[in-house]
């Protein structure tokens, strides 16, 4: 088994490379002597930087090229941010490992202000996420929310250049890049419900590659997997992509799961929220039931309005 070289398909952004190196190190620590190589590549989401993500349209903006590399044999595994992973996979591929989750929260980042509540009326806040935008606008309709694209370094540069008074980024991404000092205050799930799978790293591979799947098995984190599968089951039932105003967050206490979710209109005028508590063994069923509840409360109409501009296919 150890004469095999594992090739990791990864995006070229600093954060994606951090995640790929993390998986590389975990594999080599669990299997001394195993050779693991990175295969960096560029995705559609990396190329189109002058258009809001929601307007680019489509699921899997950051993963399709990596999946092609798996299918044609250029790579053995692909490493993703779980929040970027679509609910559907090409035939023959699947999500086989979810690593231990890091901090799932969003971060308020500013050079002048310490918290969202401290921002004066009319302040400009940058984020490319419809999920963040709808929650920001609901909480602070007096703010000007503008789109913000690019990798973490690019976004911070735009803040430092004075284009924005504050920006919202993922806590986990800043920590992984050694930029934790830029966080002025984390936003609790009550303030801003995270994206599905936020803070977790997922590994995709060919489902018939039993050798690679066996090598990956020790990297799977059971608690994280249960939480993320509940969140993803809800997202699947809502037919949500990664660029839709959907938030979901599951917490596990022993065998008891608490799942929260929301669907909002991008302008923040409509927000549908719900939650479920139940046994962890029913994580995916709870996700589906919570999605049904949200759809019945008006989430279907909100999402249809969003998809009319950007189909989720």
UniProtKB/Swiss-Prot annotation:
* Obligatory cofactor(s): dipyrromethane
The pathway it acts in is:
Porphyrin-containing compound metabolism; protoporphyrin-IX biosynthesis; coproporphyrinogen-III from 5-aminolevulinate: step 2/4
Q: Catalytic activity, per the record?
A: 4 porphobilinogen + H2O = hydroxymethylbilane + 4 NH4(+)
Q: Where are the transmembrane segments?
A: none
Q: How is the cofactor bound?
A: Binds 1 dipyrromethane group covalently.
EC assignment? 2.5.1.61
A cellular component annotation (GO) from this entry: cytoplasm
Q: Does the keyword field hold Protease?
A: no
Query: Which keywords does UniProt give here?
Result: Porphyrin biosynthesis, Transferase
The miscellaneous remark of the record is:
The porphobilinogen subunits are added to the dipyrromethane group.
Q: What does this protein do?
A: Tetrapolymerization of the monopyrrole PBG into the hydroxymethylbilane pre-uroporphyrinogen in several discrete steps.
Assembly notes: Monomer.
This protein is called Porphobilinogen deaminase
| Organism this protein belongs to | Serratia proteamaculans (strain 568)
Taxonomic classification, please? Answer: Bacteria, Pseudomonadati, Pseudomonadota, Gammaproteobacteria, Enterobacterales
Its encoding gene is what? hemC
């Amino acid at each position: 088994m150890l004469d095999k070289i594992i090739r990791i398909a990864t995006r070229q952004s600093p954060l994606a490379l951090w995640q790929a190196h993390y998986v590389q190190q975990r594999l080599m620590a669990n299997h001394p002597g195993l050779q693991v190589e990175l295969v960096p590549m560029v995705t559609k989401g990396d190329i189109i930087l002058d258009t809001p993500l929601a307007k680019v349209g489509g699921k899997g903006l950051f993963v399709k090229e990596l999946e092609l590399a798996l299918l044609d044999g250029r790579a053995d595994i692909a490493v993703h941010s779980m929040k970027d992973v679509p609910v559907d996979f090409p035939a023959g591929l699947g999500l086989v490992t979810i690593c231990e989750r890091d901090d799932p929260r969003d971060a308020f980042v500013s050079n002048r202000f310490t918290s969202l509540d401290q921002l004066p009326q009319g302040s400009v806040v940058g984020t490319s996420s419809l999920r963040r935008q709808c929650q920001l606008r609901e909480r602070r309709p007096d703010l000007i929310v503008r789109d913000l694209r690019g990798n973490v370094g690019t976004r911070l540069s735009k803040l430092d250049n004075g284009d924005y008074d504050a920006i919202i980024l993922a806590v986990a991404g800043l920590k992984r890049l050694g930029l934790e000092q830029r966080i002025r205050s984390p936003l609790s799930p009550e303030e801003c419900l995270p994206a599905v799978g936020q803070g977790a790293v997922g590994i995709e591979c060919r489902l018939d590659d039993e050798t690679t799947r066996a090598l990956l098995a020790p990297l799977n984190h059971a608690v994280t997997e249960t939480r993320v599968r509940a969140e993803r089951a809800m997202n699947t039932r809502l037919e949500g992509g990664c660029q839709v105003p959907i938030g979901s967050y599951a917490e596990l206490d022993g065998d008891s799961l608490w799942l929260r979710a929301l669907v909002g209109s991008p302008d923040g005028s409509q927000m549908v929220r719900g939650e479920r508590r139940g046994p962890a063994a029913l994580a995916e069923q709870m996700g589906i039931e919570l999605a049904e509840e949200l759809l019945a409360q008006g989430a279907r109409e909100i999402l249809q309005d969003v998809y009319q501009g950007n189909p989720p296919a």
